[in-house]
Amino acid sequence: MLQTLHNNLMSNILQDIFKDNYERMIYTLHPRKSVIENVDRMINCGDPSFGGAMYGCGKCGTLKFVPFRCHSRFCPTCGTKYSIDRTTSMSFKLINVQHRHCVFTIDSELRHFFLEDRELLGLLFEAVQSVILRMFHKDNKTEKFTPGFILVLHTFGRDLKWNPHIHCLLSEGGIGNSGLWRAKTHFNYTYLRNAFRTALLNLMEKKLGSSFKKVKAKCYKEHKEGFYVYAKPNKCNPTVVAKYIGRYLGRPVIATSRIDSYDGENVTFHYNRHEDDQ
């Protein structure tokens, strides 16, 4: 008797959307090669024609064929599994202290630079890291307290529009050169906003050259208080931190549960706005 896992034969709504609009995506949007590869893998995920593994019971003789999965983070099925595995791995590396969830955002007028040149995304990590280390080091220049932190890049917002920003899980404390641990619960928001703006704009000017100077000057003029940084206390004990990692580290772009309907042309999905959580 041969059985095939039923769920693997049924395509999810995201697969249907991309199958129906595949040619439009290829010839209208002209996506990058890596995007096409992940879409192809996601579309064919669980398709028995692409192979699988056969399992058999030595007692009753029942055979079960399990189609191979795509293992793409873009896939709502495989991406969720990746997130769970990644969360478990990272949880063992966390310091057993309170953490804080911070978000570093950029001016909307800067977003297109990162869309046109993906290598610039690395500057976001550099800027955030330098700001965090400087904030802790200046508490004691001799000890140079160093915190533990995880940085995750998101290139989209809840509305799925291009919006590169950094999520940071930061320990509320750091270890000094002498091995001394010092707790730190007060984060200077003014410093974080201004320092992040300065660090990022300087890095971008260094990378893009003198042509970026006008944009840089405009950002200083329009954002005199710096770029928005969310860093309010949120009581992230180690258990909560693990949940944050699962939520922000390697999760699929959109869960199928957020897609309300698809009629072959239009997709309706829901999300909660950061501004009012509505």
Where are these regions (language model features)?
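Beta->alpha loop/short-helix hinge microenvironment recognizer with preference
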Residues: 1-278
